[in-house]
């Protein structure tokens, strides 16, 4: 099992600082990293080496917590502890901050683009989730402020093909939102984690959602539409989400991030025990009660907490990770034979 995750290289992405988050561009050719040094770095390959192509240092006054590429790949959004979100426009190797989104009362913890590229979501320690609309002139307007959580909101993620938004919070819940008559509403609350929910990832179909938590478990939730054959109760026309699998006993500390590979279906986790783990759904497992096996476990992936794992969207098995040690590492995952 140990050979199924092979190190390709490491870069000191944010020296003397934490590296908080990573995001691949849609083409899979560039990786954005962000950190406690207030900087964003853009990484690309030259030959077999990963090199820094750009440093975005002018946008933020405090830690940059998360970054996200627009679906077209021409824009990068960055969420910062300075309570702002910057929108950067890519022009060849250069990036220009074209807009700064203000409104959150304190630290912005996450930012995510909808698959259409016309909507952006942000969330904050102020307990709110904001939905922004983007028009043809690249003007951003807040169209909804959602106050469904009772604590710090850690992460937002969009469904891969629908305008359905999910958020994870310090209040131990996951919430889902959709648009209804020109406003956004909370359409589901997923309860079951016993501590902070740190991150979320939809599977390639969008029918399942994975969540990871300070309670050291991963939960897999499945969407059931009204009138479903399984007889899962739904309220009105809203789908119901039910926990169909819990991965427990694998992680010894907080699970900070989870990534669901859109190409292979492999599930990777970033953990406070300095390790990276990869899980695969077992062949012939029951869709209503799936089982997953641990197929890779790298104990010392980094020298400190692993904060993020990110699968490349185009190259199967290429995984990037980052850590409190300031480094970004690149890995090749190969599914073990016989699984």
Curated annotation (Swiss-Prot):
Q: What else is known?
A: 'Ciao' means 'bridge' in Chinese.
Name the disease. Multiple mitochondrial dysfunctions syndrome 10: An autosomal recessive disorder characterized by proximal and axial muscle weakness, fluctuating creatine kinase elevation, and respiratory insufficiency. Additional features include learning difficulties and neurobehavioral comorbidities. Some affected individuals have mild normocytic to macrocytic anemia. Brain imaging shows increased iron deposition in deep brain nuclei in some patients.
Physiological role: Key component of the cytosolic iron-sulfur protein assembly (CIA) complex, a multiprotein complex that mediates the incorporation of iron-sulfur cluster into extramitochondrial Fe/S proteins. As a CIA complex component, interacts specifically with CIAO2A or CIAO2B and MMS19 to assist different branches of iron-sulfur protein assembly, depending of its interactors. The complex CIAO1:CIAO2B:MMS19 binds to and facilitates the assembly of most cytosolic-nuclear Fe/S proteins. CIAO1:CIAO2A specifically matures ACO1 and stabilizes IREB2.
- Gene label: CIAO1
What family classification does the UniProt entry report for this protein? Belongs to the WD repeat CIA1 family.
Q: Repeat WD: residue ranges?
A: 14-53, 59-98, 103-142, 148-187, 192-231, 250-289, 301-339
Question: What name goes with this protein?
Answer: Probable cytosolic iron-sulfur protein assembly protein CIAO1
- Which SMART domains does this UniProt record tie to the protein? WD40
Query: Does the record's keyword annotation contain Cytoplasm?
Result: yes
The organism's lineage is: Eukaryota, Metazoa, Chordata, Craniata, Vertebrata
User: Where does this polypeptide localize?
Assistant: Cytoplasm
State the oligomer form and interacting partners: Component of the CIA complex. Interacts with CIAO2A and forms a complex with CIAO2B and MMS19; the interactions with CIAO2A and CIAO2B are mutually exclusive. Interacts with CHD1L, ERCC2, IREB2 and POLD1. Component of the MMXD complex, which includes CIAO1, ERCC2, CIAO2B, MMS19 and SLC25A5. Interacts with WT1. Interacts with CIAO3. Interacts (via LYR motif) with HSC20.
